[in-house]
């Protein structure tokens, strides 16, 4: 699951925006 910073940040940003998996990533 290694991706460029831009792609990783984009996916993380979308997930955090939803807030559904924000907790999963946070922990």
UniProtKB/Swiss-Prot annotation:
SUPFAM superfamilies membership: Nucleoside diphosphate kinase, NDK (SSF54919)
Cofactor entry: Mg(2+)
Reactions listed under catalytic activity: a 2'-deoxyribonucleoside 5'-diphosphate + ATP = a 2'-deoxyribonucleoside 5'-triphosphate + ADP; a ribonucleoside 5'-diphosphate + ATP = a ribonucleoside 5'-triphosphate + ADP
Positions of ATP binding: 3
Enzyme's top EC category: transferase
GO biological process: nucleotide metabolic process
EC number in record: 2.7.4.6
This protein's UniProt keywords: ATP-binding, Kinase, Magnesium, Metal-binding, Nucleotide metabolism, Nucleotide-binding, Phosphoprotein, Transferase
InterPro entries in alphabetical order: NDK-like_dom_sf
Alphabetized GO MF terms: ATP binding; metal ion binding; nucleoside diphosphate kinase activity
Similarity annotation: Belongs to the NDK family.
Function: Major role in the synthesis of nucleoside triphosphates other than ATP. The ATP gamma phosphate is transferred to the NDP beta phosphate via a ping-pong mechanism, using a phosphorylated active-site intermediate.
Protein name in the entry: Nucleoside diphosphate kinase 2
Phylogenetic classification of the source organism: Eukaryota, Viridiplantae, Streptophyta, Embryophyta, Tracheophyta
